[in-house]
Amino acid sequence: MDNTLKFADSHEWVKDNGDGTVTIGISEHAQELLGDVVFVDLPDTEDEIEAGESFSLVESVKAASDIYAPISGEIVEINEELEDSPELINEEPYEGGWIVKVKMSDASELNNLKDAEEYLSSVEED
């Protein structure tokens, strides 16, 4: 796992791209809980998202799960690969399975997220 990733308690990860944008996906732990992903309901580019609010839905053979925005901003790119290959979330949760890229409205929100070590400790306690 990339140690530069930040995590929300709701199991989303955030990668700071260094240009005012972040990439968002769901963690390895989350995809393991979901099981085989069969569909991802992607938002539209230019949609505004608010930290803590649902912006996407991932359906698996076990359940449908809302995906929550770990930070606020405007969606600038969606991972269209997920439309035909939703299983990328299972196979590469931190690489090809990313969900959206967002232009942050407030970069300080990143400080509210856990680092990789804190996140791993929290899921091991579950």
From Swiss-Prot:
* InterPro entries assigned: Biotin_lipoyl, GCV_H, GCV_H/Fam206, GCV_H_sub, Single_hybrid_motif
- Which Gene3D superfamilies does this UniProt record tie to the protein? 2.40.50.100
Name the source's superkingdom: Bacteria
- Write out the entry's keywords from A to Z: Lipoyl
Using the record's annotation, list all stretches that form the Lipoyl-binding domain.
21-103
User: Cofactor note from UniProt?
Assistant: Binds 1 lipoyl cofactor covalently.
Cofactor(s) needed, names only, are: (R)-lipoate
GO biological process: what's one of them? Answer: glycine decarboxylation via glycine cleavage system
Provide the Gene Ontology terms for cellular component.
cytosol; glycine cleavage complex
Where N6-lipoyllysine occurs, residue numbers? K62
Q: Record's family? A: Belongs to the GcvH family.
The subunit field of the Swiss-Prot or TrEMBL record says: The glycine cleavage system is composed of four proteins: P, T, L and H.
**Functional note:** The glycine cleavage system catalyzes the degradation of glycine. The H protein shuttles the methylamine group of glycine from the P protein to the T protein.
Which protein are we looking at? Glycine cleavage system H protein
Q: Which organism is it from?
A: Vibrio atlanticus (strain LGP32)
Question: What gene name is given for the protein in this entry?
Answer: gcvH
